[in-house]
């Protein structure tokens, strides 16, 4: 057929010059569509003689295949070029560090509990635990707390309910960790040197009190244990905990489970609404302590004629507030992520005594 070479050259030239897939599709329809130029040429084969058709048919089919191949190749080239442009526009430096993911932090109470445990462990103390729901005996009777004591009042203590007709004393949410003393003495006897950190519960709620808080109990029993040992242990603890030398002051006080009993103050200064421990001329009450009452020893199965010892109890939340400048106890349990991110600790951050600082 006349003009096939020109037809071939024209379409290949136009296909090669297409700048986008839309233009390329227009060329495909114009060349190979139902009314396309090459398609119309194919229809003319029916008007030819067999001899002419034998020559023109293969030539037209070859042209059609070549144009189809050129369109496919051009389409692939345009796709590659578009991808290159996109990659340039969306280029990323894969050597840059990834954006850090938000991770949780260690709650100040958990951190301080670890610090307290580590310091006392360094002095030879082990950790003891007990149930948070206690019997009347372990929470009060065994600790020499009489039936008329104000601590037993429902306004101070959370009581559970017994079934109707059950006249046994109701269980309580323990008001202190002191019951662990009795349970440990019953099971392990004396001598002993333990601390008992854990949750305790009292019906109170204000800036410095919450219905649930954390306390650590300390108990040392031996044949020659004295108040002098108690003073040394507490001064060593506070100096290690606050990182400065801390002086203590003992004031005589009454607690049913110790005799004699003492409230312990630590040296501090009050400046601009902040408390600085270990300096100044002021004193801050920090815990209750004393020599374990003989009746408490007997309740735990210990002979008070053979063994004696001291005990103390302090609030973990309170010393956390002092050390880390936290103004309101209620914030510890408000589940405020902003507060937790500010006062929390990294998951791999060890207590200072573990790290050797």
From Swiss-Prot:
The answer on whether this UniProt entry bears the keyword Transmembrane helix reads: no
Listed cofactors: Mg(2+)
Write out the GO cellular component annotations. Answer: cytoplasm
**Entries under PROSITE patterns matching the protein:** AA_TRNA_LIGASE_II
Alphabetical GO biological process terms? phenylalanyl-tRNA aminoacylation
Give the transmembrane region(s): none
Q: Name one Pfam family in it.
A: tRNA-synt_2d
Signal sequence residues:
none
Q: Where does the chain bind Mg(2+)?
A: 259
Q: How is the cofactor bound?
A: Binds 2 magnesium ions per tetramer.
The entry lists its GO molecular-function terms as: ATP binding; magnesium ion binding; phenylalanine-tRNA ligase activity; tRNA binding
Q: Name the major location.
A: cytoplasm
Domain of life of the source: Bacteria
Location relative to the cell: Cytoplasm
Top-level EC class: ligase
Oligomeric state and partners? Answer: Tetramer of two alpha and two beta subunits.
> PANTHER family, per this entry?
PHENYLALANINE--TRNA LIGASE, MITOCHONDRIAL, PHENYLALANYL-TRNA SYNTHETASE
Instruction: Give the protein name, as stated in the record.
Output: Phenylalanine--tRNA ligase alpha subunit
Q: Which gene encodes it?
A: pheS
């Amino acid at each position: 057929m006349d003009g096939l070479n020109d037809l071939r050259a024209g379409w290949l030239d136009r296909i090669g010059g297409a700048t986008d897939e839309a233009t390329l599709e227009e060329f495909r329809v114009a060349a190979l569509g139902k009314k396309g130029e090459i398609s119309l040429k194919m229809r003319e084969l029916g008007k030819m003689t067999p001899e002419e058709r034998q020559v023109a048919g293969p030539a037209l089919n070859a042209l059609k295949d070549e144009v189809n191949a050129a369109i496919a190749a051009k389409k692939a080239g345009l796709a590659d070029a578009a991808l290159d442009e996109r990659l340039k526009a969306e280029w990323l430096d894969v050597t840059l560090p990834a954006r850090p993911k938000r991770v949780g932090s260690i709650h100040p109470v958990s951190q301080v509990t670890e610090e307290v445990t580590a310091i006392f462990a360094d002095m030879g103390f082990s950790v003891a635990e007990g149930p948070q729901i206690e019997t009347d005996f372990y929470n009060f009777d065994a600790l020499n707390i009489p039936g008329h004591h104000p601590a037993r009042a429902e306004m101070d203590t959370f009581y559970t309910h017994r079934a109707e007709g059950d006249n046994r004393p109701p269980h309580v949410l323990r008001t202190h960790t002191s019951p662990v003393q009795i349970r440990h003495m019953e099971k392990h006897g004396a001598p002993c040197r333990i601390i008992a950190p854990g949750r305790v519960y009292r019906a109170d709620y204000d800036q410095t009190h919450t219905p649930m808080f954390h306390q650590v109990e300390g108990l040392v029993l031996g044949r020659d244990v004295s108040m002098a040992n108690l003073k040394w242990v507490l001064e060593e603890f506070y100096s290690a905990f606050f990182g400065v030398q801390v002086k203590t002051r003992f004031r005589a006080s009454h607690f049913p489970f110790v005799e004699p009993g003492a409230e312990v103050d630590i040296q501090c200064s009050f400046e601009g609404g902040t408390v600085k421990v270990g300096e100044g001329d002021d004193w801050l009450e920090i815990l209750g302590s004393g020599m374990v009452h003989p009746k408490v020893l007997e309740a735990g199965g210990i002979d008070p004629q053979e063994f004696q010892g001291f005990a103390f109890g302090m609030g973990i939340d309170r010393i956390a507030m002092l050390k880390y400048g936290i103004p309101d106890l209620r914030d510890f349990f408000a589940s405020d992520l902003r507060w937790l991110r500010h006062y929390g600790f990294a998951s791999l951050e060890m207590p200072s005594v573990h790290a050797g600082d």
